[in-house]
Curated annotation (Swiss-Prot):
Residues 128-146 are annotated as: 2 X 10 AA tandem repeats of M-Q-Q-Q-Q-F-F-Q-P-Q. One of its GO terms (molecular function) is nutrient reservoir activity. Residues 1-19 form the signal peptide. CDD domains: AAI_SS (cd00261). This is Avenin-3. It comes from Avena sativa. Sequence repeats lie at residues 41-48, 49-56, 128-137, 138-146.
Length: 220
């Protein structure tokens, strides 16, 4: 009888131990407990964006400081020329060497944590210049032929109103549809290239990743 009671007690103890340490009942964070982590991440991202907005005036100054780097990138200096519409501007090797030295000198003077966003602002200025170069040609090809057809037979006082109502929305859609995706892709490609080429050329460290402004900064 005693033996039976002992076995019964041991079985009960084993059952209780199994229930207490059931792996399926281990602690798991609830969604309510995960919310503070997500909120902290969102706050950190907002702080980075606010810091970037505060740095924009400084980045515009650094953009001017890196003007030699911009000139070096757009000119036909070694294999660094990456802007198609400026490849005809070929410089002498001596001029390229001077420009390279000036670029490296200015890049070294910029604080390390600001080099990446400063290079990005230079790339944005180059792409904005490229957009300004091509957009008048696009406007001329799109606007003038259709304007000539529509304005025939329309009185001069009404012509300006009609052409503005017809062509300006279409022209805006065409230019936005062509330039905005293309410009964003060019910015990303040229930014990646510049973040590799300039540090290697100047033998300076530039962080490979940095928060960057999405809105175009002032050009040169």
């Amino acid at each position: 009888m005693k033996t039976f009671l002992i076995f019964a007690l041991l079985a009960m103890a084993a059952t209780m131990a199994t229930a207490q340490f059931d792996p399926s009942e281990q602690y798991q964070p609830y969604p309510e407990q995960q919310q503070p982590i997500l909120q902290q991440q969102q706050m950190l991202l907002q702080q980075q964006q606010q810091m970037l907005l505060q740095q924009q005036p400084l980045l515009q100054v650094l953009q001017q400081q890196l003007n030699p780097c911009r000139q070096f990138l757009v000119q036909q200096c070694s294999p660094v020329a990456v802007v198609p519409f400026l490849r005809s501007q070929i410089l002498q090797q001596s001029s390229c060497q001077v420009m390279r030295q000036q670029c490296c000198r200015q890049l070294e003077q910029i604080p390390e944590q600001l080099r990446c966003p400063a290079i990005h602002s230079v790339v944005q200025a180059i792409i904005m210049q490229q957009q300004q170069f091509f957009q008048p040609q696009m406007q001329q090809q799109f606007f003038q032929p259709q304007m000539q057809q529509v304005t025939q037979g329309i009185f001069q006082p009404q012509m300006q109103q009609v052409t503005q109502g017809i062509f300006q929305p279409q022209l805006q859609q065409v230019t936005q549809g062509i330039f905005q995706p293309q410009m964003q892709g060019q910015i990303e490609g040229m930014r990646a290239f510049a973040l590799q080429a300039l540090p290697a050329m100047c033998d300076v460290y530039v962080p490979p990743h940095c928060p960057v402004a999405t809105a175009p900064l002032g050009g040169f």
